[in-house]
Amino acid sequence: RSLRRQRQMCIRDRYMTGGIVVVLGKTGLNFAAGMSGGIAYVLDEDGTFKNRCNLAMVELEPVPEEDDLLESEHHHGGDFEHHGRVDISSDMTRYDEERLRNIISRHLKFTQSDLAKKILDEWDNFRPKFLKVMPTEYRRALEEIKAEKLNNIVAAE
């Protein structure tokens, strides 16, 4: 049974091509092998995730605190329950903190997970323990699309 569980853990997020996944539990070896798209946010409480992640196609980065970004762009600093809308799906290279917190909040709503509740209650302690896993080619493609849109806007003016 334990070997079976380890195998299940090992295959998580292999060959991921899109979407968003949040991992609150342990990962197995070779996480992200063949991951060409999408984003994974992994809770790395013990700081050992990098040793289990296949870094051939992905980069790991921290989930930054975004209060200043949200305040300057949307006037929503410190307010995750704001009444206005921020389209966090419009730019997958930004808004990580808000996106992650929203997903965990939905997880809590639908599952009553004790861990999700603890993470949200102690957000300032848990946020720095999350890593964003993003394929390098996916990031490059998103940056090219963003630059092209910006060029089209400038050209239209």
Positions of predicted regions on the chain:
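Intrinsically disordered, low-complexity terminal regions
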Residues: 29, 36-157
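A short linear-motif detector with a strong N-terminal bias
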Residues: 1-3, 18-22, 109-111
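Tandem-repeat/low-complexity and Cys-motif detector
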Residues: 12-13, 30-33
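Short "repeat-start/strand-capping" segments in structured domains, especially the N-termini
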Residues: 16-21, 34-40
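Single conserved hydrophobic/aromatic residue that forms the stacking wall/gate
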Residues: 1-13
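Feature marks extracellular polysaccharide-active and adherence modules
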Residues: 8, 15, 24-26, 43
